[in-house]
Amino acid sequence: QWQVHCLDVAALPLEQTSDKDKQLIIIAGVGGELLVELVRAILAQHPLRHLEFILCPVHHNYYVRQSLSALGLGLKSEHLLEENQRFYEILHVSTIAAPNCLPITATGSLMWQTLDEASLPRAHSYLSQVIGHYQRMPAHKQTPEIIHAYQQQLAQLLSEYE
């Protein structure tokens, strides 16, 4: 049985369900900073619950991934989606990290490992776009470690398909 709620996610009435029930919360279409705030609020309200999230931030994926990792969440799956010439990272994460989850990495892991050769141009385009985005930032806002991390991811991806 499932229910849809349209309300402040921190106010989700999870206490009305059994502690044994698994809860899947979907948050999509919001910026990365807000998405992290929402996940933090849910975890603070329900610290002992087994929760799973499907998350699709529209910006700040690097920040989102670092924050989710810092919150102790584990990665169940991740996918790169392209729609209307925009890219989206979709993350399925869980509060129960082991044994079926992986650590959440800052630039992605599973979504690159499951690529086939036909998907390589899309992945290359996405990573190039992300690198370009960070390189265009004003010098005082640039974060060389983020640029370097995505450049390494792109180089690794390209080397695997040579």
Model region roles, listed by residue range:
Residues 12-14, 24-27, 33-162:
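Class I S-adenosyl-L-methionine
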Residues 1-22:
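S-adenosyl-L-methionine
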